[in-house]
Structure formats: structure tokens, C-alpha cells
Amino acid sequence: MPKLQIELPISEANWIKHIETLQNIENIVGTKQNITTALKTSIIRDLPKEPFGILLSGGVDSSIIAKICKDQEAPFRCFCVGIKGSEDLKVSKEIARILKLELITKEFELDEIEQLLLKVIKILPKPIIRDDNYIEYMVKVSVSAVLLSAMSLGDEKIFYSGIGAEELFAGYQRHVKSVSERGTWRGIDIKGLQEESWEGLKRMNNLVISRDKLISDSMRKEIVSPYIDDKLIILAMSLPTDKKIDSNSNKKILREIAKDLGVPKEASERKKKGAQYGSSFDKAITKLTKINGFKLKKRYLDSLIAKKKV
């Protein structure tokens, strides 16, 4: 089955149709062994011969990619950004030390963050921010700032990303809700884990893939996402709930795979943090909001969007 790579644009309708086709495939049983094989294959199959980058946050998803590429003796460097003292920088440096990876990092100052946000806002489509969607746009802007800044640190044209793993292996807070109290998350009615995970995959093109493609295209670079692979999706989505999540842990089987591959526990056992939090970019935006005289981040965002018109 071919890997879905985000350098090729796909319409929202065609993306949803493709995911629904995968959803209708039956009689597939995912195991730790065949998921490991599928993940390795997805990463190794199209490894570039020229030097490439890996966006290493220090989380389990990107650390698995780095470990497999290291085992293949592939020509790559890792990249991580954040505010001074951020968790992503701290953990990624430790992972790089243990695995002997070449890691390029940058600590950003507050004034640099505002300039990054302005760059990102110019790249992304102009939003209509309302009270019920500004958090979604805030996430889009802050994560895009992390992506743009990390990819700017190197002249590599191809960067590997761990996006997709959260949906496949139940890494988000709404997945926790789906096996506990249900309810809503950012205005979305939470369903059972299986249904919620498929719905999350259907939303990925609009919320994540198209965002990352806009950023990478603006730099004339390409993002490769090995977790967004047909065979891997089918196998992972066939897993029962208890293989993915319980009251103590999420992404359970992926963490087990990471340990088997030799990924350090600093990554394999690390709890999920969004890029905006692990990098502390979200904290920086909070500080910038106050410095610029606003009480709400939404108002600060509005002021930055207004500058886009100038």
C-alpha cells in the first residue's frame, strides 16, 4: 500500500473518501510485530539518499523515526526549537546524547516569537476568529511557528515528521475522554475511541496536513510523515482499546515498540505534549499578550492578524 505523503495536495473530499475506504477494510488484526514491521517499512522505504532532517521533539513518535533512521545509517540531522528551558529542548538533547544523534537547536527570545507569529499568519489563510474557534487557530499558528522555525535551521529539503501517531495510537486528550466521561472537546461531541479515532483521521487533512504543507511549501521544502501510511493506519486502527490506552498511559503499544527498538525511556515514557507546549511557545504567546496590553490571547492574535493587512 502506498504511503500518503503531504507533498502532494489532496482535496478535503478525496481525503475523507480515502480514509473511509481504509475504515471499511475488515479482517485485519494488528499486532506489535506487524505494526513494527509496517512502521519500519514506511520509514525505510523512501529514505532519501541526500541529507534530510528529522523534527525531533523528544517525544516517542519522532524518537522512533530517529532511532530507525540511525539504525539504517541514514544521512540526517535532527532539529528542535523552543524557549529557554523548554521541555522539548531538554529532552531532545538527552535523546540525541544517548543515541549519538546530530541535533541542531535554537532558543528563541520573546521578540523573535512575535516575528515568527507574523510570518506564519502571512502564510496561513486569513481566519475568521470567533469565541468557539480561536483555540483551534491559536494551536495552528503556534505549531506552525515551531515548524517554520525548526525547518529554517537547516538547508535540508526533506524533513520527517511524527504527525499522525496521535490519531493512530490514541495520544490526544479527547481519546482519554472517549474511554471515560465522553462529553465534548473544543465543541466536538466525543464518541467511543474507535469512532473518535477515525473521525480524527478524517479531520487531519484540514487541521494538520494542509497546515504543514503551507508552511513547507513557503520554504520550498517537503515534509514526509511515515505514520500516515495506509497499511499502518489499517493495522493500528484494528487494535482494541486496551492496547492503546488505559487509566495510566496512552499510546501503549507504540511505547512498547519504542522500547523494543531501543528508544530511550526519556522518550518512550514521556507524556504527550503538543508542540506549542513542549516548546513553550504557548507560554511565550501568553507573555506577549500581556506585554502588548491585552488580557486575552484572542485579542493579541486579532492585533497580529490586523498587521497582515498592512
Show the residue positions of the predicted features.
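PAPS-dependent sulfotransferase catalytic core
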Residues: 182-183, 265-310
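N-terminal glutamine amidotransferase
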Residues: 1-23, 43, 147
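Extended hydrophobic/Leu-rich segments
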Residues: 15-29, 300-304
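Glycine-centered secondary-structure boundary/capping sites
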Residues: 2-9, 125, 170, 219-223, ...
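ATP-dependent adenylate-handling active sites, centered on carboxylate activation for C-N bond formation
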Residues: 25-261, 276-288
